Amino acid sequence: MKEGIHPKYEVISATCSCGNEFETSSTLCKNIHLDVCSACHPFYTGKQKILDTGGRVDRFNKRFGALGSKK
């Protein structure tokens, strides 16, 4: 690789909106603010919910549920 053309790689502080703070490396060279992190994201915390908006699943099963049981 060529020397002198790559940006500096430094340790920075990343702060989440939930208050979690950790250090990471970046070429940005300034502290960053995150909206979500692994401490508050629903996928990592296990608090993920699947919402049925407007009863669409029930409406689908009512209309087409009988078609699969005829076999």
UniProtKB/Swiss-Prot annotation:
Keyword flag Metal-binding: yes
Positions bound to Zn(2+): 16, 18, 37, 40
Gene3D superfamilies according to UniProt: Ribosomal protein L31
Protein name per UniProt: Large ribosomal subunit protein bL31
Entries under SUPFAM superfamilies matching the protein: L28p-like
Subunit structure: Part of the 50S ribosomal subunit.
Cofactor: Zn(2+)
Lineage: Bacteria, Pseudomonadati, Pseudomonadota, Gammaproteobacteria, Alteromonadales
